[in-house]
């Protein structure tokens, strides 16, 4: 009997050890996930300026070359034209090619004077064909076109619906283009109330706004045509509005295109080059401010 005791003791110890080994081990909780800081949303704002709008294409080309791609685009008038084509998925080089191939007659449908000498349907159709008939909300990037409500005088930011019609409304210079009726309201050029629509971009969620200002300064000299008179009036009216709007932009790009008339489609290549040069000069500022914003988030 005594000889069994050591054996029983050994067996008990073995069972105890086995039980201890079989006991579940409480897992160590994983470390809390690291909260990733959201990247700042970049808004590209393209101002109005008729034929000077070709400079926007150069600006886009240089930004793309540096990997600076906007999350949203907002445009007025000529800026709405370029912005819609860009938001549809065309890159800077595609836009440049399209600009060089475009004929003025493709976007101008002259008519007998009836609240405007250009109907605007040609521009509307040109845009819709170029973007595959997609509505605003179906474009590749978030986009808005800014127009002026002719009855209330307030800015209207189009973010859904017929893209070509919204661009046409945004570009309808009073006295040149006929007003555009959308949902029972009439709209004219957005440059009357928002030539460089920075506020619209902020309202859409932009954390960092790059604004391209192609507005013209009033010209000293003869205004040779009715259109020249109207555009001179726009330039005079828009100066104070532009200064006010640009205060809320992070970076302002001003291509040196003062020698290019708003009605001159012949110097489009020069306008593109000046847009490229203006952004290239502003790149250190853009990169420094973006880096600072990212560090602080």
Question: Model segments located where?
Answer:
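Patatin-like phospholipase
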Residues: 2-4, 8-11, 21-73, 85-297
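Gly/Ala-rich beta-loop-alpha elbow adjacent to hydrolase catalytic centers
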Residues: 75, 79
């Amino acid at each position: 009997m005594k000889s069994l005791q050591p054996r029983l003791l050994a067996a008990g110890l073995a069972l105890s050890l086995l039980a201890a080994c079989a006991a579940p081990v409480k897992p160590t909780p994983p470390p809390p996930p690291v909260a990733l800081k959201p990247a700042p949303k970049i808004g590209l704002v393209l101002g109005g300026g008729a034929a000077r709008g070709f400079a926007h294409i150069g600006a886009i080309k240089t930004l793309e070359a540096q990997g600076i791609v906007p999350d949203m685009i907002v445009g007025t008038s000529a800026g709405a034209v370029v912005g819609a084509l860009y938001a549809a998925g065309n890159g800077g080089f595609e836009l440049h090619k399209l600009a060089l191939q475009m004929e003025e007659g493709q976007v101008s449908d002259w008519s007998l004077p009836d609240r405007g000498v250009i109907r605007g349907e040609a521009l509307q159709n040109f845009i819709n064909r170029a973007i595959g008939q997609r509505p605003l909300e179906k474009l590749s990037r978030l986009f808005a076109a800014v127009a002026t409500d002719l009855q209330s005088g307030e800015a209207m930011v189009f973010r859904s619906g017929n893209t070509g019609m919204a661009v046409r409304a945004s570009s309808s210079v009073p006295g040149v283009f006929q007003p555009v009726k959308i949902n029972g309201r009439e709209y004219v050029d957005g440059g009357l109330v928002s030539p460089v629509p920075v506020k619209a971009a902020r309202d859409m969620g932009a954390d960092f706004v790059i604004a391209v200002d192609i507005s013209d300064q009033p010209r000293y000299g003869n205004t040779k045509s009715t259109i020249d008179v109207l555009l001179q009036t726009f330039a005079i009216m828009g100066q104070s509005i532009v200064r006010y709007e640009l205060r809320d932009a992070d970076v302002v790009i001003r291509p040196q295109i003062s020698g290019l008339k708003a009605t001159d489609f012949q110097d489009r290549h020069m306008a593109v080059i000046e847009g490229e040069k203006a952004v290239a000069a502003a790149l250190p500022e853009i990169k420094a401010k973006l880096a600072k914003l990212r560090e602080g988030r």
